[in-house]
């Protein structure tokens, strides 16, 4: 089944069904808070956000009686019906900052083909560019300077079959972020900037504003577009041909290693999380999302902070110092989470510290140099003592236990 609901979610469904606002035999008016709750409570890995919202609303309205069994049944039925709906071809345009001369060719993630550094003299690009400019002019008589700068950037175009343009964008963004995650792990900044008038992302490759969905001919599908925060004074990184060659080689090696991982699906999620964490203009968010990344790769849901810190520190050259840094980062994270007053000027330092702290565990998780078969094997490895005397003692005890059991 694509979806699953725990007991506490089922209690919520039961309370919803017995609410006086719900008429007998049907669901009547459903408030957005109920749908929002169920949308975040249900695990549906194969559905986009748009599809999941449709599935929940349809299941709630069509299930004759709100029971756990009927709700799940109608969720799965609705999901299968979406698969059978008419799908159309779409192309999603993503202007990319920092990818000049670096990312080219075609890649496929999931069921999405991505073409990088699209030829803007092609018939599709000419029509798409004209429609993008027209779209913006209908909102303003003059194009913002930022948008003018964006249109000069290289494009990545995602080709996808989908039920509508919103679903097409969500799936395309999900796919291309994996590719940008690969490049970001290799190219993101490792040290703080000496001079910076404002907070800028750590990633050196970014989605630029004004992302649009088009028909295969290039005509824009609707007046909707996606926009993210941007700084008009950002200068794209410059790279020599030798640097570009080295980056591409490292990306290809990392790509091959991820494809062979026993936990490949989760590793691809890590690529998305890494890109998103360090693409923020608000570096406090980068710091917090960096900690979430540590939680994602450092253990299961029940893993405590002390254990996460110990595991991340174990893989560093100086575990004792790294553990102290990890405890400091956790303290700052707790202060921010609870709304305590901190020095905002240290956001950049914290973000880079977090990135550096999680890096060894991240690289080990994505490359699996010790050929572990399960994530838990990696975590157990990181739980071993750092001190050689303690390791020797533990090894002797294990050898003694093995000898005893073999008798």
Q: Model-predicted segments: where are they?
A:
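Charged, amphipathic alpha-helical stretches
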Residues: 1-29
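Charged, non-catalytic interaction/linker regions at domain boundaries
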Residues: 23, 32, 36-285, 361-364, ...
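Short runs of predominantly hydrophobic/aromatic residues within well-ordered alpha helices
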Residues: 267-270, 283-290, 294, 322, ...
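Glycine- and acidic
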Residues: 272-278, 313-315, 339-343
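Flexible secondary-structure boundary motifs
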Residues: 287-320
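Charged/polar positions within long, soluble alpha-helices
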Residues: 302, 334-341, 363-371
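Histidine-centered, metal-coordinating catalytic motifs and their short helical/loop contexts
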Residues: 319-351, 359
């Amino acid at each position: 089944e694509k979806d699953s609901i725990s007991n506490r979610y089922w209690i919520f469904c039961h309370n919803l069904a017995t609410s006086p606002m719900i008429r007998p035999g049907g669901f009547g008016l459903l408030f957005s808070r109920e749908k929002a709750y169920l949308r975040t409570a249900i695990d549906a890995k194969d559905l986009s956000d748009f599809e999941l919202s449709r599935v929940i609303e349809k299941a709630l309205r069509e299930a004759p009686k709100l029971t756990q069994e009927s709700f799940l049944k109608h969720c799965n039925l609705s999901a299968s019906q979406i698969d059978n709906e008419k799908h159309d071809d779409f192309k999603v345009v993503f202007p990319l900052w920092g990818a000049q001369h670096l990312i080219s060719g075609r890649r496929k993630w999931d069921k999405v083909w991505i073409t990088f550094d699209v030829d803007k003299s092609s018939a599709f690009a000419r029509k798409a560019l004209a429609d993008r400019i027209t779209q913006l002019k209908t909102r303003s008589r003059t194009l913002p300077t930022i948008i003018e700068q964006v249109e000069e950037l290289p494009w990545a175009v995602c080709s996808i079959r989908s039920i509508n343009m919103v679903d097409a964008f969500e799936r395309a963004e999900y796919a291309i972020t994996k590719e940008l995650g690969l490049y970001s792990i290799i190219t993101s900044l490792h040290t703080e900037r000496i001079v910076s008038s404002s907070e800028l992302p750590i990633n050196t490759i970014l989605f630029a504003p004004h992302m649009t969905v088009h028909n295969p001919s290039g005509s824009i599908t609707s007046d909707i577009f996606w926009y993210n925060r941007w700084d008009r004074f950002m200068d794209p990184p410059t790279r020599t041909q030798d640097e570009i060659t080295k980056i591409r080689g490292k990306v290809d090696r990392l790509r091959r290693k991820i494809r062979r991982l026993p936990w490949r699906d989760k590793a691809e999620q890590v690529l998305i999380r890494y890109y998103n964490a360090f693409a923020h203009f608000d570096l406090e968010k980068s710091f917090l999302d960096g900690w979430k990344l540590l939680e994602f790769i450092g253990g299961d849901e029940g893993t405590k902070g002390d254990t996460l810190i110990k595991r991340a520190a174990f893989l560093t050259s100086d575990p004792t110092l790294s553990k102290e840094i990890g405890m400091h980062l956790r303290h700052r994270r707790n202060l921010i989470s609870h709304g305590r007053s901190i020095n905002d000027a240290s956001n950049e330092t914290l973000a880079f510290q977090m990135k550096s702290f999680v890096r060894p565990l991240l690289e080990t998780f994505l490359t699996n140099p010790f050929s572990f078969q399960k994530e838990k094997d990696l975590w157990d490895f990181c739980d071993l003592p750092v001190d050689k005397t303690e390791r020797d003692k533990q090894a002797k005890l294990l050898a003694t236990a093995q000898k005893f059991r073999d008798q």
